[in-house]
Structure formats: structure tokens, C-alpha cells
């Protein structure tokens, strides 16, 4: 099951780059994002009101506000920077490379922020993953001409936004059903992108059929599949493992682009894909066992600190949502 979820996640997340390219020729980034999330948010709110009321019980305003912040970081901030970078002329390969740094950043911060143990095998896999992404995208990045240097900082900011959302979710103590999280995230993104589009005069959608085909692509594959599976795998396997799968996005996108758009796919891309696969295997095999570590904790009643044996799981283990409302196909 974990392997199938991982494969579905990689394909769904990679589809976002393909969908962005499909829509880039017909509308601006903010127009695409507004019409991607506005109808989706309406549908999700209606479904939640009719079928998913039980999933919302017990959640406080603070819980929902936290999810709104997570949605702002993981959807609005991340996607706007990716789409805007492509609009500025940064290639999809270079954007994927910068996004590929995310697992290394998240893995490095998992220890001090979440007190999670990252093994040497996992670090090896993380560095191999970076190498694989670099191999795939290096030629494309060096060949780019006419792109301002500051434009390459845009997807980097998006990567940091997604890292921040990942850690904010991992530190949440209240379990939020994926269906609820998806609704809040998409609703937040719809409000932000609509406000942005209206304020910049970019709200009117083009009449081209290709635009609406791209919107449908992004809603079904990238939104329901990509983000939903991201949070689902995060809760099942932890920060290090879920982010290591991000290393496969650039190679998979390169293969997909070769078949769909006729983009070149040579030996360098094939080598990078193999290295990325090896990295994922190393990390997933190296993190199977949890490590028991003694941490010092001061009792509330005072007195000297005491040593408490504490098993560090791969990720905080929230209670699973009610099975009747569990998101089976993914989310944004």
C-alpha cells in the first residue's frame, strides 16, 4: 500500500508541472490558479456541508486557522512561486531542481525542530537524491538565456514555503481529517487567488479550450492527487521519507515531458532518474526502525529533571480520521 501511494503521489505531483505548461500559453499564473481553486473550493464546501459534517466535529477555530495557514504556505505560496517562475522564463527543469532541494532542507531540520532521528543511510539517500535531480536539470539550467538572475529565487521561496507548511503540520497536536484539511486549504487558496486576480485585473478566463483542459488537469491530478497524497504519506511515513519522494519529481517530469511535448530525453536524464530511484530505496530501507532516545523532561510538579525513555516515531502519529470520511483518492 505504501509503495502504491508513493507512486501515485509522484505521478500526481509531477502532473502539476505538466499542467502549468499546458496553461502557460493561454493565461497568466494568477488566472490559472484562481480558476483552478475557485470551483474546486465551492464543490468541497458543498460536499462538506452535505456529507462530511462528522469530520468537522471537535475541531476548534484555532485548529481551522492553523490549517488555513498551512494551506496558504503549501498551496498559495508554493504554487504561485512555481507558476510565476515559469512565467518569468525559468524552465520547468530548473524549477524542479530548486524544488528538489526541499527534502534536504526538511531532513536537516527534522532533528532540531521535530526531534526525529535521521540515520546515516537516510542522509546518504538524501544527498544521492540531490545528485540525481542535479544531473537531470543541469543541462537545462545552464542553457537558459534571457532570464534575470533574481527569477531563480522565486521557486526557491516556494520551496521554503512548502517546507514551513510541512513542519507546521507535523507539529500539530490535533488530528485533522484529510478531507477537512483539503477543504480548508483549497478554500483559503481560492480566496487569496481570487482577491489577487481581481486586484490585478486578471480574473477573466480566456475562451480557449486548452485553458479549461489545463484547469481540469490541475484540479483532478495535481490538486486531488498531489497535495492530498502529500499529507497522507506525511502522516503515515514522516517528514524525511515523504520529502525524499520529491527527488523523483524532476526525472519523472522530464520523462513525461518527453512523451507529451517531445522534449529531449537523453542519457543524462536517464542516469538522473536511476540515481533518484536509488536514493528513495536507500531512505525507505534505512528508516524502518525507530530509535529510542533518552530525553530530559522536567515534571510539572517541580524537582530535578528525570530521564524518560522516549521512542521517536517517523512522524507524530495523530489518531486516524473516521474511515467513513477518509480521503481515499488524494487531495490538492
Report each predicted region and the residues it spans.
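Glycine-/small-residue-enriched transmembrane alpha-helix faces in small-molecule transporters
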Residues: 1-34, 40-42, 81, 144-171, ...
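Cytoplasmic-side transmembrane-helix entry/capping segments in multi-pass membrane proteins
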Residues: 6, 62-69, 118-131, 152, ...
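Specific transmembrane alpha-helical segments of multi-pass solute transporters/efflux pumps
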Residues: 12, 16-17, 45-99, 135, ...
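Transmembrane alpha-helices of multi-pass small-molecule transport proteins
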Residues: 25-77, 103-110, 160-168, 182-201, ...
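Helix-helix packing/entry segments at the starts of transmembrane helices
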Residues: 33-35, 79, 94-101, 167-191, ...
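C-terminal-most transmembrane helix of multi-pass membrane proteins
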Residues: 36-38, 138-139, 210-213, 247-332
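Hydrophobic transmembrane alpha-helices of multi-pass small-molecule transport proteins
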Residues: 44, 109, 118-140, 159, ...
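Loop-to-transmembrane alpha-helix entry segments
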Residues: 58, 96-99, 115-135, 145-152, ...
Amino acid at each position: 500500500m505504501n509503495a502504491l501511494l508513493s507512486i501515485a503521489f509522484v505521478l500526481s505531483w509531477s502532473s502539476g508541472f505538466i499542467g502549468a505548461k499546458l496553461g502557460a500559453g493561454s493565461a497568466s499564473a494568477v488566472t490559472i490558479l484562481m480558476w483552478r481553486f475557485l470551483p474546486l473550493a465551492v464543490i468541497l464546501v458543498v460536499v462538506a456541508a452535505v456529507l462530511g459534517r462528522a469530520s468537522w466535529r471537535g475541531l476548534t477555530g484555532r485548529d481551522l486557522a492553523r490549517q488555513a495557514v498551512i494551506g496558504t504556505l503549501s498551496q498559495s505560496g508554493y504554487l504561485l512561486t512555481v507558476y510565476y517562475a515559469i512565467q518569468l522564463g525559468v524552465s520547468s527543469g530548473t524549477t524542479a531542481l530548486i524544488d528538489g532541494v526541499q527534502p534536504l532542507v526538511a531532513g536537516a531540520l527534522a532533528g532540531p525542530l521535530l526531534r526525529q532521528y535521521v540515520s546515516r543511510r537516510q542522509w546518504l539517500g538524501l544527498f544521492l537524491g540531490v545528485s540525481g535531480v542535479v544531473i537531470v536539470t543541469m543541462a537545462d539550467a545552464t542553457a537558459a538565456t534571457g532570464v534575470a538572475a533574481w527569477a531563480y529565487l522565486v521557486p526557491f521561496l516556494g520551496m521554503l514555503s512548502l517546507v514551513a507548511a510541512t513542519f507546521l503540520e507535523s507539529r500539530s497536536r490535533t488530528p485533522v481529517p484529510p478531507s477537512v484539511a483539503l477543504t480548508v486549504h483549497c478554500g483559503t487558496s481560492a480566496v487569496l487567488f481570487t482577491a489577487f486576480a481581481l486586484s490585478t485585473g486578471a480574473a477573466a478566463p480566456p475562451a480557449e479550450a486548452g485553458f479549461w483542459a489545463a484547469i481540469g488537469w490541475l484540479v483532478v491530478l495535481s490538486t486531488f492527487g498531489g497535495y492530498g497524497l502529500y499529507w497522507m504519506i506525511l502522516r503515515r511515513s514522516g517528514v524525511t521519507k515523504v520529502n525524499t519522494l520529491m527527488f523523483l519529481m524532476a526525472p519523472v517530469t522530464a520523462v513525461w515531458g518527453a512523451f507529451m511535448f517531445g522534449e529531449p530525453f537523453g542519457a543524462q536524464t536517464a542516469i538522473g532518474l536511476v540515481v533518484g530511484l536509488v536514493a528513495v530505496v536507500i531512505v525507505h530501507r534505512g528508516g524502518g526502525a525507530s530509535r529510542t532516545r533518552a530525553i530530559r523532561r522536567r515534571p510539572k510538579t517541580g524537582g530535578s529533571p528525570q530521564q524518560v525513555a522516549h521512542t521517536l516515531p517517523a512522524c507524530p502519529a495523530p489518531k486516524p480520521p473516521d474511515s467513513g470520511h477518509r480521503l481515499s483518492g488524494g487531495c490538492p
